[in-house]
């Protein structure tokens, strides 16, 4: 999926996160994480984010994740929503989506 415009999804409530995405100027994936549980789960959050981007076919994005203790499924859902909004797609092909392990 091509990121066409900045977009975000989520809240700053406990057990949630805000994910913001925007097009990358140098065609790379950049993930910046701010989290209340970064020391314990930072590597796992980054892994979930990279896997979600791979499953969505995103090869170029700048992503900011502001996490307040969200579960992996919440993080993935917020990433999916932000990417879909940024890609300006109105319908998602769930039949071809690869679920995370």
Swiss-Prot record:
CC terms in the record's Gene Ontology section: cytoplasm
Modified residues (O-(phosphoribosyl dephospho-coenzyme A)serine): 14
Swiss-Prot/TrEMBL keywords: Cytoplasm, Phosphoprotein
Stored InterPro entries: CitD, Mal_deCO2ase/Cit_lyase_ACP
Pfam families in the record: ACP
HAMAP family given in the database record: CitD (MF_00805)
Family: Belongs to the CitD family.
Function: Covalent carrier of the coenzyme of citrate lyase.
Full protein name: Citrate lyase acyl carrier protein
Species this chain originates from: Clostridium perfringens (strain SM101 / Type A)
Organism placement in taxonomy: Bacteria, Bacillati, Bacillota, Clostridia, Eubacteriales
């Amino acid at each position: 999926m091509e990121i066409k415009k900045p977009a975000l999804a989520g809240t700053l409530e406990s057990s949630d996160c805000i994910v913001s995405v925007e097009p990358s100027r140098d065609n790379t994936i950049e993930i910046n994480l701010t989290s209340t549980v970064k020391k314990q789960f930072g590597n796992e959050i980054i892994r979930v984010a990279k896997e979600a981007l791979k499953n969505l076919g995103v090869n170029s994005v700048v992503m900011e994740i502001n996490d307040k203790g969200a579960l992996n499924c919440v993080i993935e859902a917020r990433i999916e929503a932000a990417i879909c909004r940024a890609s300006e797609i109105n319908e998602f092909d769930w039949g071809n989506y690869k679920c995370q392990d």
